Amino acid sequence: GCHISRALLKKFHDPEHIYYAEYEQLLQIKGIGPKRAKLIYNTKCLSQAEKIMENCHKHKIKIMTINDDIYPKKAKMFDDMPIIMYYKGTPTPDVMNQKSVAIVGARRCSRQARQTAIDLAVALSDKGITIVSGMAKGIDSYAQTACLKNEGYTIAVLGNGLDICYPTEHEKLMDQIEKNGMLLSEYEPGIKPQKVYFPRRNRIIAALSDEIIVVEAKKGSGALITAQYGENYHRKVIRLM
């Protein structure tokens, strides 16, 4: 998990030193017992990592680690953030650390909510604020499309590998975000969308954002999960409808 990965990186500083760590060294890390230390020590197979790298190269996907300048500082402080993320697009350290606001909400939304999402995205991007969302149907896509039309910067956090477009009808939007923003995922190429991945994805949306605006959402929705993560991360959360 992310907690163990961060503990390993904190102790050994880089993946190469983790790879060559002795069993006794692994045991010294808090949260790693004998069983887990043995698993880490015995699972030293580079073939899987090489396959991921090949797939990334094939699909023009880049990798950021928690030690990179483009990894957002506002997200680094949380222990449940991945130490590695995959991305496509045009991030810079300045862009990744400028003010950002998440606009999230229902897939099936009212006309009023749709217009609110569009108006918010335009007003915020006018101020140079990054729009963060999940490229889902409804509020997400309305906000991100409006941001791009207004020549703003947007980050789409996906719940699958970046070689897959989900939902499939958002191929054009995905291409536009890659050219004028950033596509981001903790999942390597080839990982298909699964229901369990989207709530986890929402924690990254929350961590990347200084504020979270829920335009319209039903009980138990992904947007409210994002809002809950935001509150846990001490972000400003605004619920409009």
PLM feature spans:
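Glycine-biased, small-residue-rich flexible motifs in mid-sequence functional cores and linkers
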Residues: 65-241
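Short, positively charged patches
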Residues: 1-122
